[in-house]
Amino acid sequence: MSRVGKLPITIPEGVKIGLNDLEVKISGPKGELSKTFKGNIAISLVENKLLVKPLAANKNARAMWGTARSIISNMVTGVKEGFKLKLEINGVGYRAMVKGKYLNLMLAKSHNTKIEIPSDIKIEMPKQNIIILEGTDKEKLGQFASIIIKQRPPEPYKGKGIKFENQFIPRKEGKKN
């Protein structure tokens, strides 16, 4: 039995839920999200609480049970409060800036890297080396953050690169002569 899946999802004030078979539409003060689930699960709304249950006892249905519950819970949190990710850019001459709908990264390459910003993600830059990403969809936010980090992942010798705010980078010793 799934420990995550059996927990009900409480619907906060100001959040509306629309159920259509395995399609869930959630709208709130921060926006609207929808997702269609596949698999052997049933989603029901009972007294301002969402319940997810497996329709079969096989391994796939049990796996989807907890996953679907977590995704729906993140959707509810996203439309109510939103999600924030903070990225740090470390390195001499490494910086970023927003130009229109593009994030321009200067990361000691022969060219600047331009990344198109998805329409549902907002970027704030208090400094040139700090990027704050905000959005309602936790999955898309993490995906976009990983695309940014992939441009220059942190290296273990000097710690240069792009990383999450409190991410620990294990350091290595340099060459000894």
Curated annotation (Swiss-Prot):
<dbReference type="InterPro" id="IPR020040">
    <property type="entry name" value="Ribosomal_uL6_a/b-dom"/>
</dbReference>
<dbReference type="GO" id="GO:0003735">
    <property type="term" value="F:structural constituent of ribosome"/>
</dbReference>
<keyword id="KW-0694">RNA-binding</keyword>
<dbReference type="GO" id="GO:0005840">
    <property type="term" value="C:ribosome"/>
</dbReference>
<dbReference type="InterPro" id="IPR002358">
    <property type="entry name" value="Ribosomal_uL6_CS"/>
</dbReference>
<dbReference type="InterPro" id="IPR000702">
    <property type="entry name" value="Ribosomal_uL6-like"/>
</dbReference>
<dbReference type="GO" id="GO:1990904">
    <property type="term" value="C:ribonucleoprotein complex"/>
</dbReference>
<comment type="function">
    <text>This protein binds to the 23S rRNA, and is important in its secondary structure. It is located near the subunit interface in the base of the L7/L12 stalk, and near the tRNA binding site of the peptidyltransferase center.</text>
</comment>
<keyword id="KW-0699">rRNA-binding</keyword>
<keyword id="KW-0687">Ribonucleoprotein</keyword>
<dbReference type="InterPro" id="IPR036789">
    <property type="entry name" value="Ribosomal_uL6-like_a/b-dom_sf"/>
</dbReference>
<dbReference type="InterPro" id="IPR019906">
    <property type="entry name" value="Ribosomal_uL6_bac-type"/>
</dbReference>
<comment type="similarity">
    <text>Belongs to the universal ribosomal protein uL6 family.</text>
</comment>
<dbReference type="GO" id="GO:0002181">
    <property type="term" value="P:cytoplasmic translation"/>
</dbReference>
<dbReference type="Pfam" id="PF00347">
    <property type="entry name" value="Ribosomal_L6"/>
</dbReference>
<protein>
    <recommendedName>
        <fullName>Large ribosomal subunit protein uL6</fullName>
    </recommendedName>
</protein>
<dbReference type="GO" id="GO:0019843">
    <property type="term" value="F:rRNA binding"/>
</dbReference>
<keyword id="KW-0689">Ribosomal protein</keyword>
<comment type="subunit">
    <text>Part of the 50S ribosomal subunit.</text>
</comment>
